[in-house]
Amino acid sequence: MSLRQVWRRNREEARLRRQLRSTLRRAGIAEPTDMLEVCERLSAIWPVPIVAAPFDLPAHGPFGLTIRYAPEPRDEAIYILYQRVATPLHQQHVVAHELGHVLGGHPLEPVNDLSEIDPSGSTGTLRRTSYNSRVEREAETIATVLLGRAAAQEGVTLPSNDARDHRLRRVLGDKVEWL
């Protein structure tokens, strides 16, 4: 990879981080949080709801997939399905990665067989198993940003929930460069 390519990729990643910061602010997400809550909050500002749910995916298949599903036109939603038997940490990563596809505006592939789900309402799915493409790298970058500082939040507990304590938690428990 040439120096120019590295520079271009770094610029693209910086642009992606700025866009993600803006989207998360609009959704009211100011600090690291659980990916299911991120989905819930993003649903408030996204054109359709974003729902993450555990699912019994085949063991030899992907750990997660994203489906845009509309059994009825007014009931359209984006479903992020993740492997039910994966560890909780892996589930968080899978949801963050699939959110990366959603937030990145990645196109859906045609659905061929979703025998476990009523296929008549599905308009497409994201089914990829390789990180070699631009969209996979972009989704992984978004996942990394979403999860990058989440662990810092878990170790800080406060005696109360007033504004000073909240500020103290932000200052001591979370780095400014989280996003």
Can you name each region flagged by the protein language model?
Residues 30-45, 52-62:
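Short secondary-structure junction/hinge motifs that connect adjacent elements
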Residues 4-42, 109-179:
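Metalloprotease/metallohydrolase-associated module, dominated by Zn2+-dependent proteases
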